[in-house]
């Protein structure tokens, strides 16, 4: 089953600010995520039904929430991996 991909409005703005290379890397990972969104190794324990995608080379993270009743992968935050800012943004937006 393939999940639908949606963005929080603020996450979409963050996405649009990314460079082309970083965006392409995330697109490749998201293509895998919409097929199999629940990867246990990427689960965030502090946020319910949330998972992360890490781009180690560029230092970016993307946080998404799996919404089963809507069969949706919902992107909550995209940001640099600095002082856990990406996780704090996700927590505030889901809060």
Residue locations for each model-derived region?
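Solvent-exposed, charged interface segments at domain starts and junctions
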Residues: 1-2, 41
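Enriched for short, Lys/Arg-rich terminal
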Residues: 2-4, 12-13, 17, 24, ...
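Short, conserved clusters of charged catalytic residues that mark active-site
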Residues: 10, 25, 45-48
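Compact soluble domain cores
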Residues: 21-33
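A short, surface-exposed loop/turn module that caps and links secondary-structure elements
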Residues: 31-55
């Amino acid at each position: 089953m393939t999940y639908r991909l949606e963005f929080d409005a603020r996450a979409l703005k963050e996405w649009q600010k990314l460079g082309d290379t970083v965006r392409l890397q995330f697109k490749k990972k998201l293509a895998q995520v919409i097929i199999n969104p629940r990867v246990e190794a990427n689960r965030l324990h502090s946020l319910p039904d949330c998972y992360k995608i890490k781009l180690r080379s560029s230092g970016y993270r993307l946080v998404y929430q799996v919404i089963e009743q809507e069969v949706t992968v919902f992107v909550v935050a995209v940001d640099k991996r600095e002082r856990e800012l990406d996780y704090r943004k996700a927590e505030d937006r889901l809060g």
